[in-house]
UniProtKB/Swiss-Prot annotation:
Residues 324-350 are annotated as: Disordered. It is a single-pass type II membrane protein. Gene3D superfamilies: 2.120.10.10. Substrate binds at residues 118, 152, 276-277, 292, 371. GO terms for biological process: carbohydrate metabolic process; viral budding from plasma membrane. It is found in: Virion membrane; Host apical cell membrane. N-glycosylated. Keywords: Calcium, Disulfide bond, Glycoprotein, Glycosidase, Host cell membrane, Host membrane, Hydrolase, Membrane, Metal-binding, Signal-anchor, Transmembrane, Transmembrane helix, Virion. Its EC number is 3.2.1.18. Residues 333-347 have a biased composition (Low complexity). This is Neuraminidase. Ca(2+) binds at residues 293, 297, 324.
Length: 469
Protein backbone atom coordinates (compact mmCIF):
# COMPACT_ATOMS: atom_id res chain seq x y z
CA UNK A 1 0.00 0.00 0.00
CA UNK A 2 1.54 3.28 -1.07
CA UNK A 3 1.59 6.34 1.22
CA UNK A 4 -1.46 7.94 -0.41
CA UNK A 5 -3.57 4.81 0.12
CA UNK A 6 -2.48 4.64 3.79
CA UNK A 7 -3.54 8.25 4.29
CA UNK A 8 -6.93 7.61 2.64
CA UNK A 9 -7.51 4.44 4.73
CA UNK A 10 -6.61 6.15 8.03
CA UNK A 11 -8.80 9.11 7.12
CA UNK A 12 -11.77 6.85 6.34
CA UNK A 13 -11.43 4.97 9.64
CA UNK A 14 -11.10 8.25 11.57
CA UNK A 15 -14.18 9.66 9.83
CA UNK A 16 -16.17 6.53 10.66
CA UNK A 17 -15.16 6.68 14.34
CA UNK A 18 -15.96 10.40 14.48
CA UNK A 19 -19.39 9.76 12.95
CA UNK A 20 -20.16 7.00 15.50
CA UNK A 21 -19.07 9.23 18.40
CA UNK A 22 -21.20 12.08 17.05
CA UNK A 23 -24.28 9.83 16.86
CA UNK A 24 -23.63 8.56 20.41
CA UNK A 25 -23.46 12.12 21.72
CA UNK A 26 -26.77 12.91 20.00
CA UNK A 27 -28.35 9.80 21.61
CA UNK A 28 -27.06 10.78 25.06
CA UNK A 29 -28.38 14.32 24.59
CA UNK A 30 -31.84 13.04 23.56
CA UNK A 31 -31.92 10.66 26.54
CA UNK A 32 -30.93 13.44 28.94
CA UNK A 33 -33.64 15.80 27.65
CA UNK A 34 -36.29 13.05 27.73
CA UNK A 35 -35.53 12.08 31.34
CA UNK A 36 -35.38 15.72 32.38
CA UNK A 37 -38.93 16.35 31.16
CA UNK A 38 -40.28 12.98 32.39
CA UNK A 39 -39.38 13.75 36.00
CA UNK A 40 -41.89 16.61 35.88
CA UNK A 41 -44.71 14.42 34.56
CA UNK A 42 -45.56 12.84 37.95
CA UNK A 43 -49.26 13.46 38.43
CA UNK A 44 -49.03 16.80 36.59
CA UNK A 45 -52.57 18.14 36.07
CA UNK A 46 -54.06 19.10 32.75
CA UNK A 47 -54.14 22.85 32.14
CA UNK A 48 -57.86 23.01 32.95
CA UNK A 49 -57.77 20.66 35.96
CA UNK A 50 -58.56 22.10 39.41
CA UNK A 51 -56.11 20.99 42.09
CA UNK A 52 -57.23 20.45 45.70
CA UNK A 53 -56.30 23.12 48.22
CA UNK A 54 -55.45 20.84 51.12
CA UNK A 55 -51.77 20.12 51.78
CA UNK A 56 -50.20 17.04 50.23
CA UNK A 57 -47.76 15.02 52.29
CA UNK A 58 -44.77 13.58 50.40
CA UNK A 59 -43.94 10.21 51.91
CA UNK A 60 -40.63 9.62 50.11
CA UNK A 61 -38.44 11.47 47.59
CA UNK A 62 -35.76 9.26 46.03
CA UNK A 63 -33.11 10.37 43.54
CA UNK A 64 -31.83 7.67 41.22
CA UNK A 65 -28.36 8.13 39.67
CA UNK A 66 -27.82 6.58 36.23
CA UNK A 67 -24.30 6.53 34.68
CA UNK A 68 -24.10 6.61 30.87
CA UNK A 69 -20.69 6.95 29.24
CA UNK A 70 -19.37 9.26 31.99
CA UNK A 71 -22.54 11.39 31.77
CA UNK A 72 -24.64 11.67 35.00
CA UNK A 73 -28.41 11.81 34.65
CA UNK A 74 -30.62 12.40 37.71
CA UNK A 75 -34.11 10.89 37.59
CA UNK A 76 -36.61 11.72 40.34
CA UNK A 77 -39.01 8.88 41.16
CA UNK A 78 -42.60 10.09 41.49
CA UNK A 79 -43.47 10.78 45.17
CA UNK A 80 -46.28 8.82 46.81
CA UNK A 81 -49.26 10.91 47.95
CA UNK A 82 -50.69 9.98 51.37
CA UNK A 83 -54.46 10.29 51.67
CA UNK A 84 -56.94 10.38 54.54
CA UNK A 85 -58.60 7.07 55.40
CA UNK A 86 -62.30 6.75 54.55
CA UNK A 87 -63.06 3.13 55.54
CA UNK A 88 -65.50 2.77 52.63
CA UNK A 89 -64.90 -0.94 52.02
CA UNK A 90 -67.48 -3.46 53.30
CA UNK A 91 -67.07 -5.33 56.56
CA UNK A 92 -65.42 -8.73 56.17
CA UNK A 93 -67.73 -11.73 56.54
CA UNK A 94 -66.29 -13.99 59.21
CA UNK A 95 -66.93 -17.38 60.80
CA UNK A 96 -65.18 -16.52 64.06
CA UNK A 97 -61.83 -15.32 65.38
CA UNK A 98 -58.25 -16.57 65.14
CA UNK A 99 -55.23 -15.78 67.39
CA UNK A 100 -53.18 -12.80 66.26
CA UNK A 101 -50.85 -11.56 69.04
CA UNK A 102 -49.91 -12.04 72.72
CA UNK A 103 -47.31 -9.94 74.56
CA UNK A 104 -46.70 -12.03 77.76
CA UNK A 105 -45.79 -8.88 79.69
CA UNK A 106 -46.34 -10.31 83.19
CA UNK A 107 -44.34 -13.49 82.58
CA UNK A 108 -41.48 -11.38 81.20
CA UNK A 109 -41.69 -9.07 84.22
CA UNK A 110 -40.48 -11.91 86.45
CA UNK A 111 -36.99 -11.43 85.03
CA UNK A 112 -36.94 -8.15 83.13
CA UNK A 113 -37.73 -4.45 83.27
CA UNK A 114 -41.32 -4.26 82.01
CA UNK A 115 -43.72 -1.37 82.69
CA UNK A 116 -46.66 -1.68 85.07
CA UNK A 117 -49.73 -0.93 82.95
CA UNK A 118 -53.47 -1.15 82.63
CA UNK A 119 -56.17 -0.02 80.17
CA UNK A 120 -54.42 -1.44 77.07
CA UNK A 121 -55.71 -1.19 73.51
CA UNK A 122 -54.64 -1.72 69.90
CA UNK A 123 -54.85 0.58 66.88
CA UNK A 124 -53.30 0.48 63.41
CA UNK A 125 -51.95 2.98 60.91
CA UNK A 126 -52.31 2.04 57.21
CA UNK A 127 -49.24 -0.20 57.38
CA UNK A 128 -48.73 -1.50 60.91
CA UNK A 129 -50.53 -2.18 64.21
CA UNK A 130 -49.49 -0.82 67.59
CA UNK A 131 -50.36 -1.60 71.18
CA UNK A 132 -51.03 1.13 73.72
CA UNK A 133 -51.45 1.14 77.49
CA UNK A 134 -51.47 3.54 80.41
CA UNK A 135 -48.22 3.10 82.32
CA UNK A 136 -47.91 3.67 86.06
CA UNK A 137 -44.54 5.42 85.89
CA UNK A 138 -42.70 2.34 87.10
CA UNK A 139 -41.54 -1.13 86.17
CA UNK A 140 -42.97 -4.13 87.99
CA UNK A 141 -39.80 -5.14 89.88
CA UNK A 142 -39.64 -1.73 91.57
CA UNK A 143 -40.97 -0.54 94.93
CA UNK A 144 -42.94 2.17 93.10
CA UNK A 145 -45.18 -0.64 91.79
CA UNK A 146 -46.75 -0.97 95.26
CA UNK A 147 -50.41 0.10 95.29
CA UNK A 148 -50.65 0.59 91.50
CA UNK A 149 -54.28 -0.48 91.65
CA UNK A 150 -55.12 3.25 91.62
CA UNK A 151 -56.31 4.61 88.27
CA UNK A 152 -55.43 8.30 88.38
CA UNK A 153 -51.98 9.56 89.38
CA UNK A 154 -49.89 12.30 87.72
CA UNK A 155 -47.13 9.84 86.78
CA UNK A 156 -49.27 7.81 84.38
CA UNK A 157 -48.34 8.11 80.71
CA UNK A 158 -49.60 6.68 77.44
CA UNK A 159 -47.18 4.04 76.12
CA UNK A 160 -46.91 2.99 72.46
CA UNK A 161 -45.09 0.02 70.94
CA UNK A 162 -45.39 -2.06 67.81
CA UNK A 163 -47.96 -4.81 68.43
CA UNK A 164 -46.33 -7.79 70.12
CA UNK A 165 -43.50 -5.79 71.70
CA UNK A 166 -43.90 -5.61 75.51
CA UNK A 167 -43.53 -2.23 77.18
CA UNK A 168 -39.80 -2.34 77.98
CA UNK A 169 -37.65 0.54 79.29
CA UNK A 170 -37.10 1.89 75.78
CA UNK A 171 -40.83 2.30 75.18
CA UNK A 172 -41.99 5.69 73.94
CA UNK A 173 -44.15 7.71 76.35
CA UNK A 174 -46.53 9.49 73.98
CA UNK A 175 -48.17 11.83 76.48
CA UNK A 176 -49.18 12.32 80.12
CA UNK A 177 -52.47 10.49 80.65
CA UNK A 178 -54.60 8.41 82.99
CA UNK A 179 -57.28 8.08 80.31
CA UNK A 180 -56.68 8.01 76.56
CA UNK A 181 -57.67 7.21 72.99
CA UNK A 182 -55.59 7.07 69.78
CA UNK A 183 -56.27 6.77 66.05
CA UNK A 184 -54.54 7.35 62.70
CA UNK A 185 -56.31 9.44 60.04
CA UNK A 186 -54.14 8.14 57.18
CA UNK A 187 -51.55 10.91 57.54
CA UNK A 188 -50.65 11.04 61.23
CA UNK A 189 -51.54 9.81 64.73
CA UNK A 190 -54.02 11.60 66.96
CA UNK A 191 -53.71 10.99 70.71
CA UNK A 192 -56.34 12.14 73.20
CA UNK A 193 -54.71 12.28 76.64
CA UNK A 194 -56.53 13.09 79.89
CA UNK A 195 -54.67 13.93 83.10
CA UNK A 196 -54.88 16.26 86.10
CA UNK A 197 -57.11 16.73 89.13
CA UNK A 198 -60.27 14.63 89.38
CA UNK A 199 -62.34 17.82 89.62
CA UNK A 200 -60.49 19.78 86.95
CA UNK A 201 -58.72 17.48 84.48
CA UNK A 202 -57.34 18.45 81.08
CA UNK A 203 -57.63 16.59 77.78
CA UNK A 204 -54.71 17.29 75.43
CA UNK A 205 -55.04 16.63 71.69
CA UNK A 206 -51.70 15.65 70.16
CA UNK A 207 -51.48 15.30 66.37
CA UNK A 208 -48.39 14.30 64.43
CA UNK A 209 -46.30 14.69 67.58
CA UNK A 210 -47.50 18.23 68.36
CA UNK A 211 -49.96 19.58 70.91
CA UNK A 212 -52.73 21.09 68.80
CA UNK A 213 -55.66 21.68 71.18
CA UNK A 214 -56.99 21.04 74.69
CA UNK A 215 -60.22 21.08 76.67
CA UNK A 216 -60.88 21.22 80.39
CA UNK A 217 -63.32 19.31 82.55
CA UNK A 218 -66.92 20.41 81.93
CA UNK A 219 -68.58 18.69 84.91
CA UNK A 220 -65.68 18.67 87.39
CA UNK A 221 -66.00 14.92 87.98
CA UNK A 222 -63.25 12.84 86.31
CA UNK A 223 -63.20 13.76 82.64
CA UNK A 224 -62.50 10.48 80.83
CA UNK A 225 -62.49 8.89 77.39
CA UNK A 226 -62.61 5.55 75.58
CA UNK A 227 -59.48 3.53 76.54
CA UNK A 228 -59.51 2.20 72.96
CA UNK A 229 -59.11 3.58 69.46
CA UNK A 230 -61.00 6.58 68.13
CA UNK A 231 -62.04 6.59 64.45
CA UNK A 232 -61.17 8.97 61.58
CA UNK A 233 -63.10 9.26 58.29
CA UNK A 234 -61.95 11.60 55.51
CA UNK A 235 -59.77 13.61 57.89
CA UNK A 236 -62.31 14.03 60.69
CA UNK A 237 -61.75 12.01 63.86
CA UNK A 238 -64.38 11.41 66.53
CA UNK A 239 -63.95 10.46 70.17
CA UNK A 240 -66.49 9.92 72.97
CA UNK A 241 -65.78 11.61 76.31
CA UNK A 242 -67.70 11.58 79.61
CA UNK A 243 -67.53 13.83 82.67
CA UNK A 244 -69.70 13.18 85.71
CA UNK A 245 -70.84 10.44 88.05
CA UNK A 246 -69.64 6.88 87.46
CA UNK A 247 -72.84 5.53 88.99
CA UNK A 248 -75.40 8.21 88.16
CA UNK A 249 -76.21 10.85 85.58
CA UNK A 250 -73.15 12.08 83.68
CA UNK A 251 -72.47 14.44 80.78
CA UNK A 252 -71.26 12.59 77.67
CA UNK A 253 -70.10 14.54 74.63
CA UNK A 254 -68.84 13.47 71.23
CA UNK A 255 -65.92 15.51 69.92
CA UNK A 256 -64.97 15.95 66.26
CA UNK A 257 -61.30 16.70 65.56
CA UNK A 258 -59.43 17.64 62.38
CA UNK A 259 -55.62 17.42 62.47
CA UNK A 260 -55.71 17.83 66.24
CA UNK A 261 -58.11 20.80 66.38
CA UNK A 262 -61.59 20.44 67.88
CA UNK A 263 -64.07 21.51 65.18
CA UNK A 264 -67.36 20.50 66.81
CA UNK A 265 -68.80 19.05 70.02
CA UNK A 266 -72.16 17.23 70.08
CA UNK A 267 -74.06 16.24 73.24
CA UNK A 268 -75.22 12.66 73.67
CA UNK A 269 -78.79 12.17 72.49
CA UNK A 270 -81.06 9.15 72.17
CA UNK A 271 -82.08 6.63 74.82
CA UNK A 272 -78.72 5.67 76.35
CA UNK A 273 -78.76 6.56 80.06
CA UNK A 274 -75.09 6.24 80.95
CA UNK A 275 -72.08 5.95 78.64
CA UNK A 276 -68.42 5.24 79.41
CA UNK A 277 -65.39 3.59 77.77
CA UNK A 278 -66.81 3.19 74.28
CA UNK A 279 -65.36 0.74 71.74
CA UNK A 280 -65.82 2.41 68.35
CA UNK A 281 -65.52 1.21 64.76
CA UNK A 282 -66.03 2.74 61.29
CA UNK A 283 -69.38 1.99 59.63
CA UNK A 284 -68.93 4.10 56.50
CA UNK A 285 -69.85 6.89 56.17
CA UNK A 286 -70.47 7.02 59.91
CA UNK A 287 -69.03 5.66 63.18
CA UNK A 288 -70.64 3.25 65.66
CA UNK A 289 -69.67 2.68 69.30
CA UNK A 290 -70.53 0.00 71.86
CA UNK A 291 -70.10 1.29 75.38
CA UNK A 292 -70.41 0.61 79.12
CA UNK A 293 -73.49 1.63 81.14
CA UNK A 294 -72.09 1.86 84.65
CA UNK A 295 -75.39 2.93 86.19
CA UNK A 296 -78.55 1.16 85.06
CA UNK A 297 -77.84 -1.53 82.50
CA UNK A 298 -75.84 -4.69 81.94
CA UNK A 299 -76.91 -4.47 78.29
CA UNK A 300 -74.48 -2.31 76.35
CA UNK A 301 -75.31 1.17 74.98
CA UNK A 302 -74.91 1.86 71.25
CA UNK A 303 -73.93 5.29 69.90
CA UNK A 304 -74.37 6.13 66.20
CA UNK A 305 -72.28 9.12 65.11
CA UNK A 306 -73.11 10.94 61.86
CA UNK A 307 -69.80 12.26 60.54
CA UNK A 308 -71.44 14.64 58.05
CA UNK A 309 -73.84 16.65 60.22
CA UNK A 310 -72.46 15.73 63.68
CA UNK A 311 -75.82 14.32 64.80
CA UNK A 312 -75.93 11.61 67.48
CA UNK A 313 -78.35 8.80 68.27
CA UNK A 314 -78.10 6.13 70.94
CA UNK A 315 -79.84 2.93 72.00
CA UNK A 316 -78.87 -0.48 73.44
CA UNK A 317 -77.71 -3.77 71.91
CA UNK A 318 -80.83 -5.90 71.35
CA UNK A 319 -79.29 -9.24 72.33
CA UNK A 320 -80.80 -10.78 75.45
CA UNK A 321 -77.41 -12.39 76.03
CA UNK A 322 -75.97 -9.21 77.49
CA UNK A 323 -72.31 -8.21 77.38
CA UNK A 324 -71.46 -6.45 80.65
CA UNK A 325 -70.16 -7.80 83.97
CA UNK A 326 -71.78 -8.23 86.44
CA UNK A 327 -75.01 -9.45 84.83
CA UNK A 328 -77.90 -11.85 85.39
CA UNK A 329 -77.62 -15.42 84.15
CA UNK A 330 -78.56 -15.86 80.51
CA UNK A 331 -81.99 -17.32 81.28
CA UNK A 332 -83.15 -14.20 83.13
CA UNK A 333 -81.22 -11.41 81.36
CA UNK A 334 -83.10 -9.08 79.01
CA UNK A 335 -82.70 -6.25 76.51
CA UNK A 336 -85.37 -4.39 74.54
CA UNK A 337 -83.00 -2.46 72.20
CA UNK A 338 -83.98 0.97 73.51
CA UNK A 339 -83.49 1.17 77.27
CA UNK A 340 -81.16 -0.05 80.03
CA UNK A 341 -82.37 -3.35 81.47
CA UNK A 342 -81.93 -2.30 85.12
CA UNK A 343 -80.11 -5.56 85.84
CA UNK A 344 -76.90 -5.23 87.88
CA UNK A 345 -75.85 -2.09 86.06
CA UNK A 346 -73.08 -1.12 88.46
CA UNK A 347 -70.12 -1.37 88.22
CA UNK A 348 -69.49 -2.84 84.74
CA UNK A 349 -66.46 -3.40 82.51
CA UNK A 350 -65.27 -2.08 79.14
CA UNK A 351 -66.29 -4.38 76.28
CA UNK A 352 -67.23 -4.54 72.61
CA UNK A 353 -69.64 -5.87 70.01
CA UNK A 354 -70.30 -5.17 66.33
CA UNK A 355 -73.27 -5.55 64.03
CA UNK A 356 -73.38 -8.09 61.20
CA UNK A 357 -76.64 -7.50 59.35
CA UNK A 358 -79.40 -8.40 61.81
CA UNK A 359 -76.94 -10.36 63.94
CA UNK A 360 -74.29 -9.27 66.42
CA UNK A 361 -70.81 -10.55 67.24
CA UNK A 362 -69.81 -9.92 70.84
CA UNK A 363 -67.33 -10.78 73.56
CA UNK A 364 -67.73 -10.94 77.35
CA UNK A 365 -66.31 -12.49 80.51
CA UNK A 366 -67.39 -16.09 81.07
CA UNK A 367 -68.18 -15.34 84.71
CA UNK A 368 -71.36 -13.32 85.18
CA UNK A 369 -70.00 -11.88 88.44
CA UNK A 370 -66.23 -11.44 88.06
CA UNK A 371 -63.71 -10.41 85.42
CA UNK A 372 -62.64 -13.97 84.75
CA UNK A 373 -62.66 -16.04 81.58
CA UNK A 374 -63.52 -14.65 78.16
CA UNK A 375 -65.76 -15.86 75.34
CA UNK A 376 -66.99 -14.68 71.96
CA UNK A 377 -70.06 -15.69 69.97
CA UNK A 378 -72.62 -14.55 67.42
CA UNK A 379 -76.24 -13.88 68.40
CA UNK A 380 -78.77 -14.48 65.62
CA UNK A 381 -81.03 -11.42 65.43
CA UNK A 382 -78.96 -9.84 68.19
CA UNK A 383 -78.80 -6.50 66.41
CA UNK A 384 -82.44 -6.17 65.37
CA UNK A 385 -84.66 -8.39 67.54
CA UNK A 386 -85.36 -7.50 71.19
CA UNK A 387 -84.14 -10.09 73.70
CA UNK A 388 -82.75 -12.46 71.05
CA UNK A 389 -80.80 -15.34 72.61
CA UNK A 390 -79.89 -17.76 69.81
CA UNK A 391 -76.10 -18.17 70.10
CA UNK A 392 -73.76 -19.74 67.52
CA UNK A 393 -70.00 -19.98 66.85
CA UNK A 394 -68.99 -19.69 70.51
CA UNK A 395 -65.25 -19.61 71.24
CA UNK A 396 -63.35 -19.64 74.53
CA UNK A 397 -60.52 -17.11 74.49
CA UNK A 398 -59.58 -17.37 78.18
CA UNK A 399 -60.87 -20.24 80.31
CA UNK A 400 -63.01 -19.45 83.36
CA UNK A 401 -60.20 -20.29 85.82
CA UNK A 402 -58.09 -17.33 84.67
CA UNK A 403 -58.45 -13.57 85.01
CA UNK A 404 -59.48 -11.29 82.16
CA UNK A 405 -60.42 -7.58 82.28
CA UNK A 406 -61.21 -4.84 79.79
CA UNK A 407 -61.67 -5.66 76.11
CA UNK A 408 -62.15 -3.56 73.02
CA UNK A 409 -62.34 -3.50 69.25
CA UNK A 410 -60.04 -2.25 66.50
CA UNK A 411 -60.42 -2.32 62.72
CA UNK A 412 -57.93 -3.37 60.03
CA UNK A 413 -58.43 -2.48 56.36
CA UNK A 414 -57.57 -5.20 53.87
CA UNK A 415 -57.57 -5.20 50.08
CA UNK A 416 -61.26 -6.05 49.79
CA UNK A 417 -62.86 -5.54 53.20
CA UNK A 418 -62.50 -4.20 56.73
CA UNK A 419 -61.75 -6.80 59.38
CA UNK A 420 -62.77 -6.51 63.02
CA UNK A 421 -60.29 -7.51 65.70
CA UNK A 422 -60.37 -7.38 69.49
CA UNK A 423 -57.99 -7.47 72.43
CA UNK A 424 -58.50 -8.79 75.96
CA UNK A 425 -56.74 -7.28 78.97
CA UNK A 426 -55.39 -10.02 81.25
CA UNK A 427 -55.18 -8.38 84.68
CA UNK A 428 -52.87 -9.81 87.35
CA UNK A 429 -52.09 -8.80 90.92
CA UNK A 430 -54.42 -6.84 93.14
CA UNK A 431 -57.24 -6.75 93.93
CA UNK A 432 -57.76 -10.47 93.30
CA UNK A 433 -54.20 -11.72 93.98
CA UNK A 434 -53.13 -10.26 97.33
CA UNK A 435 -49.74 -12.01 97.54
CA UNK A 436 -48.34 -9.07 95.57
CA UNK A 437 -48.80 -5.31 95.95
CA UNK A 438 -48.95 -4.38 92.27
CA UNK A 439 -51.64 -4.46 89.58
CA UNK A 440 -50.68 -4.88 85.92
CA UNK A 441 -51.69 -6.70 82.75
CA UNK A 442 -50.71 -8.46 79.55
CA UNK A 443 -52.90 -8.74 76.44
CA UNK A 444 -54.07 -11.29 73.90
CA UNK A 445 -55.37 -10.26 70.47
CA UNK A 446 -57.66 -12.06 68.00
CA UNK A 447 -58.90 -11.09 64.53
CA UNK A 448 -61.87 -12.15 62.44
CA UNK A 449 -61.37 -15.06 60.05
CA UNK A 450 -63.42 -16.54 57.22
CA UNK A 451 -61.58 -19.83 57.64
CA UNK A 452 -61.81 -22.65 60.13
CA UNK A 453 -60.27 -22.63 63.59
CA UNK A 454 -59.67 -24.84 66.60
CA UNK A 455 -59.99 -24.45 70.35
CA UNK A 456 -57.79 -23.37 73.23
CA UNK A 457 -57.29 -20.91 76.07
CA UNK A 458 -54.81 -18.01 76.11
CA UNK A 459 -54.53 -16.71 79.70
CA UNK A 460 -51.80 -14.45 81.02
CA UNK A 461 -49.89 -17.51 82.20
CA UNK A 462 -47.63 -16.02 84.88
CA UNK A 463 -47.14 -18.03 88.09
CA UNK A 464 -47.83 -15.43 90.78
CA UNK A 465 -45.37 -17.19 93.11
CA UNK A 466 -42.53 -16.44 90.68
CA UNK A 467 -43.32 -12.74 90.60
CA UNK A 468 -41.76 -9.84 92.54
CA UNK A 469 -43.94 -8.81 95.48
Amino acid sequence: MNPNQKIITIGSVSLTIATVCFLMQIAILVTTVTLHFKQHECDSPASNQVMPCEPIIIERNITEIVYLNNTTIEKEICPEVVEYRNWSKPQCQITGFAPFSKDNSIRLSAGGDIWVTREPYVSCDPGKCYQFALGQGTTLDNKHSNDTIHDRIPHRTLLMNELGVPFHLGTRQVCVAWSSSSCHDGKAWLHVCVTGDDKNATASFIYDGRLMDSIGSWSQNILRTQESECVCINGTCTVVMTDGSASGRADTRILFIEEGKIVHISPLSGSAQHVEECSCYPRYPDVRCICRDNWKGSNRPVIDINMEDYSIDSSYVCSGLVGDTPRNDDRSSNSNCRNPNNERGNPGVKGWAFDNGDDVWMGRTISKDLRSGYETFKVIGGWSTPNSKSQINRQVIVDSNNWSGYSGIFSVEGKRCINRCFYVELIRGRQQETRVWWTSNSIVVFCGTSGTYGTGSWPDGANINFMPI
